[in-house]
Each structure stands twice: as structure tokens, then as C-alpha cells.
Amino acid sequence: QPWREVNPETAGRAEEQMENLVRFLQTRGIVVHRPRPLTEEEEGFLKEYGTFSNQLFPRDSVLVVGNHVIEVSMRMVTRAKENFGLRDLFLRLAAERDCHYVSMPFNLPSGAFEPPRDTGPMLEGGDVAVLGHDILVGINRTTKSATNDGGIRWLQQYLGDAYRVQPVPLTKDILHLDDGFAAVREGLAIIMPEQFAEGLPPLLRDWEFVEVSKWEALNYLAGNGLVLGPNEILIDDRLPHVAEALARHGVTVHTITYDAITPWSGGLRCSHHPIVRELD
């Protein structure tokens, strides 16, 4: 049953906030592509393993790394249907541009209430941070809730020597790396330190940080900002102290109301996926 029928008020607020985000981006000259609605047949894909679907968070189901577009294999297998709404766009862009469009191996599904199990390589976009030719990939080996070691190996093997893929172990309460990590520019990031099970990755140890609490990261998605370019970011307006701290580092900070979206376990980074960046 559609969310807008179950709770019209909260659904309406969420739709309004998403449209406000789109308008903000468009007024800055950014071309925004939207997933198309799923057909009834697509909605029913693997329905025996769960019928829930949404298209709020395109970050997780695809990766764009250089000229590679990768449909990933997610832990919650019913989320695979989300790419049906994006595939026409990526096929068209792949034909227009010099890029490689591939899909990871599809995994054997497991039931929604079964214990997590590894049935193949699994990788989710929320775990992936591309920092030049270094790629950090979060992994929760305790809960096995998203990316696994097979997915990290697959990504390194696919990309080859041009990129260095580095696992980042996460603590048990954390779903994705971007719950508490956002690189605002080279050398500066928003972080929630408690999420790093083995401490900061060596790549980040000389960086400066704006720290957020675990509560802010899990409830407000405080580390989940939308980086518009080096030294410019859009964050949730419930985090004025984060905005002030970033401004002291010379960052241009924009804020937006997003409190009707974050209860679905995603923030501003989750809600978008940059395809092409053109920087001055």
C-alpha cells in the first residue's frame, strides 16, 4: 500500500522536502535526473522475499567511479528493483558518453527475517567514498548488514590497479560508512569517530575533522551531507553547530529542512548520486 495512502501528512511533507531539494540543485545550474515510477511488474520483483520498495535513496544501488557505472548487489535483495527506475537513464548516458556500464553478480535471495548470509559479493553505495584514486569502503563484519568482503574484492578486481580500494571496518550499530563520514574537501571531513571499529583509516589520519555525535549521526544523518563541490556542502538545518564549525574552516554551508526524509534511514547524500561533475 503506498505510503501516501497510509499516512498522507508525513508522505506529503517528505515529497515537499524532496522537491525543495531538487529546486535548490536546479537553481544552481545542476541537471537533476529522477527515477521513473516502477511498473506493477517491477514492483512485484522477488515479492516472495519482501514487498517494500521506495526510490528515495539512489545512492545505494549504483556506483559511479570515474567512467564506470556499476549496478551493485545489495544485501536486501528486494532493493534490486530500484534500478529498474534508473536503468533507462544509465543506458542512455552510457550510449552518449565514454563509459563502462556493468552490473555485479546477482546474489541468491534470502528471506526478510532470515539471518544475514553471504551468497556472493555484496556492495552498497552508502559504504563507498571515492577520494581521487583511493576508495574507502565501509564494512560491518559484526552485523553483516550491507557490504561484505567479497564485494570489496570484486570492486578492486573490476577497477584494477588504477584505484586502491581500502576496507573500513564499522562498529555494530552502523549500516553504512556515510552514516558518519563526509569528505568536504581534501583534508577536511565530517566524522562520527565512534563508527570506526579499528580507528581512522591511514589515508585520513592527517586530516582535520568536524565531529558529530553518534546520536546525531544515527538520528539526523549528520555525516550524510550533499557535497556540492570542494569546500561547499548542503546539510540538514537541525545541525547549526556543524554549519558553524564548517564555516570556521572556510566552507560554504547551505542548510535545508529534511526531517521528513531522515526517519527512513537516509539523508542528503543517500538521496542523490552524482553522475558527472564539472569543476572550475
Q: What spans do the regions from the language model cover?
A:
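The feature marks the mature, well-folded catalytic cores of soluble enzymes
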Residues: 1-280
